[in-house]
Amino acid sequence: MRRALVVAPLLSCVLLAAGAPAVPLDAARAYTPLGVRIEATEYRGRKALRVVEPAVGQGGGIALAHGITFASGTIEADLAGAPAPGAAEGARGFIGIAFRVQADPQRYECFYLRPTNGRTDDQLRRNHATQYISEPEFPWQRLRKEQPGVYESYVDLEPGVWTHIRIVVDGTRARLYVHDAPQPVLIVNDLKLGDTQGGIALWIGQGTEAYFSSLKITPK
């Protein structure tokens, strides 16, 4: 039986299965912050988890969800990202979800968005609105240099606006869906960590102020 694990960043962690109870969790205790600071708040009418760097420009990081091991299946999230006050000119509001996070939490797969690229007049930047990376061996710089355009794509985005994303992972393949679209905006057929498993984390890049209002995981 497929079971959906819903991690509501503020208040609860709920395993959705026949008769399964809700397990209340405090937001700060539901995640381990690694290179980020997290706090419960309200944003644009929703209870949310705010994720920022301890100091703007330090390089981003992750908030690792407790008690989750994920191999294949579906990950859904509602998120909103924008450049943080005082961020450098190159900040794009980088925000996403890391998956298959390894015991060394610097090793993971990730899909993320660049919200300020979504409606810019620069077509090349628009083409870079979404991104796949596999840290630490395959950051965006290496992927763009070695295979330009393969691990990035366009999608309409607005900074600071709630955006629904869905990541479907199957073995060494993954698909990113945005705005409940029936077709993926980015397809990866060669996940760099291979067919493995690991944790799930909220992800932000350098100079980002991020908000997450839900996280739902459905194992395959």
Predicted regions and their residues:
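Extracellular glycan-recognition regions
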Residues: 19-220
